[in-house]
Amino acid sequence: MKKIVFTGGGTVGHVTLNLLLIPKFIKEGWQVHYVGDKHGIEYQEIQKSGLDVTFHSVATGKLRRYFSWQNLLDGFKVVWGIFQSLGIMLKVRPQALFSKGGFVSVPPVIAARLSGVPVYVHESDLSIGLANKIAYKCATKMYATFEQPSSLNKIEHVGAVTKVGSQESVLPQELEEIRQYFDKELPTLLFVGGSAGAKVFNDFVSQNQAALTERYNVINLTGDASLDVLSERLFRRAYVTDLYQPLMDLADVVVTRGGSNTIFELLAMAKLHIIVPLGREASRGDQIENADYFVKKGYAKQLAEEQLDMSHLQAALDDLLANQASYHQAMKNSQEIKSVDEFYALLKADIDKGKK
């Protein structure tokens, strides 16, 4: 039986593509394994998916670009994780390893290289993260959402891989109930922050609820069940599954962080959006670079986190809505989207070519 190992985690963004690809491999008879941290979000997402995947937990350590005594302890964890991953590779003997990045992916990627397993890596951001810089050295091939320097000759620019916008969504009954609380004459805003950046949006909506709902219907995907509410012109929910795409369709404008997965989903839908990227104090600055790229391309507006107030938000919304035709046209003209099926076919072809 053909076998493949997936890895990637730390945030939902480092798991999403894996969850889209795994069912396709299973359908074609592959045995699928996943290497990550049993305490990490990757384990939660795999368990929640119900997919027939064997999960292997290994020691992982956070990768830092600055000096910290914690680096010594985490260095030992990474080394131990490599030995654990080597044992997994030698036992499973997969045809390939696919990594979506994140610090949890470093031990299995290195182990795969050491054991002669072809390594395929995906990088979503404009600047390559530290984990994927290490992975590049071990990679048979790396796929990139953004164009990268030609000197990195193992990288193929594939654009964003997304399933959103490729098919009609089925409307859950709950959507009609939500609509009954909304004013049809007002535009609808959707705030979505992702696993690492929702709190700022949650606080903003809580502090400005009256001002927001006076002018807009507001949807807030919070990640915090204590904030769940459905009231006049306001719907707040911790997590949504079947409702996600219908709510996106309902929204006139989405206010989002700058994670690559989400903003390219919005591009695929040609959905008006404002990007409020995580700042450099909370990240390596990749979301700022992603947002700058989208603004330069004419896809979106951008607000710095410290600019997130009613005055700046209203100015950005006024511009988006007044010039929506040009934003929509720029997004519709984009050639930066690849379907999951297209990417799966590419990956499979490369794995077949890479077999020894």
From Swiss-Prot:
Pfam families: Glyco_tran_28_C, Glyco_transf_28. Signal peptide: none annotated. It is a peripheral membrane protein. CDD domains: GT28_MurG (cd03785). Disulfide bonds: none annotated. Its EC number is 2.4.1.227. This is UDP-N-acetylglucosamine--N-acetylmuramyl-(pentapeptide) pyrophosphoryl-undecaprenol N-acetylglucosamine transferase. It comes from Streptococcus sanguinis (strain SK36).
